């Protein structure tokens, strides 16, 4: 039977075809970019039993298949991209060879050792990670413990009683992009542990590609026993002293971690790599930060090309040679190039797709849509060099805000494990980059780009008389505002010198760049254009106060819009927002948790229409509305 909450949620999306004009623009983007919920405990895959020696066991394929959700469109293709096939036999033999590379814990710090197409961090092959040294290290069991957005996580139980984590990336990007992200993430984690002394799991080995015994790119690391900090995060709880305390108990440790990673100032913009994972030219650029006096850390890391998602996500049709023209690294004296490069690679990507369409090479993307994308990203490229004045006298501590600092995009309670020892271990540093702090965004779990509501009864006239659905919409906006404000309080507490990023004007000025980093849908370029258009009314004031990099005598807005263009833009944006807020599961990209997917199919609400595509039968939802008395609907 379809649960009341699922039915009501779908029914509201079907019957309430529009939100009030005051709300729709502010929450549509938030809905469109929200993170799909983690599957509940009841969604864990069923057990698959197989012997390590039974290589032809047909049951094994289920062990590698994605099972925590389904998609409304291209379901088969998207699941195929998320298959994580690897050699169980190869892993067993490889792990035993890695165990033979242990060095005394008193040994000097070594560079990652190349081993069978992989790299081993020998200093992390310790008793607390692998257990006691034995003649043969065996894998007793392998279990799948998480299927995330970008990786699948397996838990390996060893004959020594210790556990390891094997992380296999999905095939969502090019092989080169996956390799670069793995190399950079491992180096970043190594830097956080060795240089900053932060609590992160020890990584013992990594393979940037599938040319190894495991036959897959991977990261092999220490298993941390504990609970996710996310279990304590209740962002939509009504105000109370307890709510305030609970929210701060989650925000505070993440803010403290950010404070520590902001300490080092780097010599270039880009991403971190091990010394031997960058070109000879980049090796010769010198240390990634100044003032290193610890000899064992010299020549351990270097700044290389950025692995920020703008340079990897959705760029499969671009050659790596083209991507390398835009992904850095960049000199510390040129922070504007960090922004401009994002606009340039999006222009190149759209033009390349347009050329494929013109050549009739099978790409079905709308030609008009691609031309609109190109126009918008050309606008972004045109305005980017002027967006923020790195010498502005009106921005407090402006020089500090533009210095190269480490940015971790996935600071989130989902990526914090509270260990049984009481420590907060941080995981998942994929896509970390070195950029000006002023160009970073808040962590997604607290970030809110919509209209701010600080007091429901003061800011929203007639709130008490509204119907429950309308109240919920405004309450959502209020809670998002509250949570972001709590984050800013913590930021100010730790880094008062960087608090200027909380200025509404700074947020508005960098919004076009941040929107370009957060493209999830082919029409999300409209949010980039909207962020640029929004600047027009305040531009003259920004020029006068030297917030933007434009001569004070030149008050003209850099982009020349005509009325026809703006009218069409507003129409397109409204259509896109309406599609977002009125289409079931649009906020998750059409992804549905597997238990809900199964239930909807059984109820006849979800119907397969061929080629791995499904559609929602809205009439079925309306036939079986939830009871207002709190009872389950009748079958």
From Swiss-Prot:
It is found in: Mitochondrion. It comes from the Eukaryota. InterPro entries: Kinase-like_dom_sf (IPR011009), Mito_inheritance_9 (IPR051035). Keywords: Mitochondrion, Transit peptide. SUPFAM superfamilies: Protein kinase-like (PK-like). Residues 1-71 form a transit peptide. Residues 1-17 have a biased composition (Polar residues). Residues 1-49 are annotated as: Disordered. One of its GO terms (cellular component) is mitochondrion. Its main location: mitochondrion. Belongs to the AIM9 family. This is Altered inheritance of mitochondria protein 9, mitochondrial. The gene is AIM9.
């Amino acid at each position: 039977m379809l649960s009341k909450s699922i039915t009501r949620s779908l029914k509201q999306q079907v019957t309430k075809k529009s939100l009030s004009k005051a709300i729709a623009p502010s929450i549509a983007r938030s809905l469109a970019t929200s993170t799909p919920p983690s599957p509940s405990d009841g969604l864990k895959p069923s057990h698959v039993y197989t012997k390590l020696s039974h290589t032809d066991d047909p049951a094994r394929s289920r062990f590698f298949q994605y099972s925590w959700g389904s998609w409304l469109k291209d379901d088969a293709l998207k699941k195929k991209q998320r298959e994580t096939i690897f050699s169980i036999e190869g892993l067993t033999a490889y792990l035993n060879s890695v165990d033979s590379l242990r060095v005394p814990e008193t040994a000097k710090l070594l560079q990652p050792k190349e081993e069978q197409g992989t790299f081993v961090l020998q200093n992390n092959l310790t008793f607390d990670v692998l257990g006691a040294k034995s003649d043969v290290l065996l894998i007793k069991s392998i279990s799948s413990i998480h299927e995330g957005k970008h990786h699948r996580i397996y838990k390996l139980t060893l004959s020594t009683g210790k556990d390891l984590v094997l992380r296999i990336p999905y095939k969502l990007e090019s092989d080169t992009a996956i390799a670069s992200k793995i190399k950079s993430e491992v180096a970043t984690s190594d830097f956080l542990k060795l240089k900053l002394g932060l609590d992160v799991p020890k990584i013992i080995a990594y393979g940037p590609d599938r040319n190894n015994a495991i036959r897959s790119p991977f990261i092999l690391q220490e298993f941390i026993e504990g609970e996710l900090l996310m279990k304590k995060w209740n962002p939509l709880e009504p105000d109370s002293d307890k709510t305030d305390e609970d929210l701060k108990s989650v925000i505070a440790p993440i803010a403290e971690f950010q404070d520590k990673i902001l300490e080092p100032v780097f010599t270039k913009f880009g991403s971190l790599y091990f010394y031997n994972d960058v070109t000879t030219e980049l090796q010769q650029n010198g240390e990634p930060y100044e003032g290193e006096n610890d000899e064992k850390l010299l020549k351990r890391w270097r700044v290389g090309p950025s692995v920020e998602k703008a340079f990897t996500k959705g760029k499969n049709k671009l050659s790596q040679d083209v991507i390398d023209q835009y992904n850095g690294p960049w000199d510390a004296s040129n922070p504007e190039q960090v922004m401009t490069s994002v606009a340039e690679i999006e222009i190149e990507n759209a033009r390349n797709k347009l050329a494929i369409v013109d050549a009739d090479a099978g790409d079905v993307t709308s030609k008009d849509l691609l031309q609109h994308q190109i126009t918008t990203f050309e606008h972004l490229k045109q305005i980017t060099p002027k967006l923020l004045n790195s010498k502005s006298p009106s921005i407090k501590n402006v020089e500090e805000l533009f210095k190269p600092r480490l940015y971790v995009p996935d600071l989130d309670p989902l990526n914090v494990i509270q260990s049984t020892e009481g420590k907060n271990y941080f995981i998942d540093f994929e896509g970390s980059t070195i950029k000006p702090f002023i160009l970073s965004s808040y962590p997604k779990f607290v970030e809110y780009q919509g209209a701010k509501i600080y007091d429901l009864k003061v800011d929203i006239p007639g709130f008490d008389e509204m119907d429950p659905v309308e109240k919920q919409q405004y309450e959502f906006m209020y809670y998002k505002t509250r949570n972001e404000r709590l984050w800013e309080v913590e930021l100010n507490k730790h880094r008062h010198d960087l608090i200027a990023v909380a200025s509404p004007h700074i947020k508005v000025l960098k919004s076009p760049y941040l929107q370009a980093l957060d493209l999830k849908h082919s029409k999300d370029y409209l949010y980039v254009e909207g962020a640029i258009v929004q600047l027009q009314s305040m531009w003259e004031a920004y020029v006068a106060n030297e917030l933007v990099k434009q001569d004070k005598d030149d008050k003209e807005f850099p982009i020349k819009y005509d009325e026809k263009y703006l009218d069409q833009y507003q129409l397109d944006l409204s259509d896109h927002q309406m599609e977002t807020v009125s289409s079931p599961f649009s906020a998750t990209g059409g992804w549905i948790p597997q238990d809900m997917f199964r239930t909807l199919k059984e109820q006849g609400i979800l119907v397969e229409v061929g080629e791995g595509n499904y559609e929602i039968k809205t009439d079925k939802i309306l036939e079986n509305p939830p009871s207002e008395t709190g009872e389950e609907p009748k079958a």
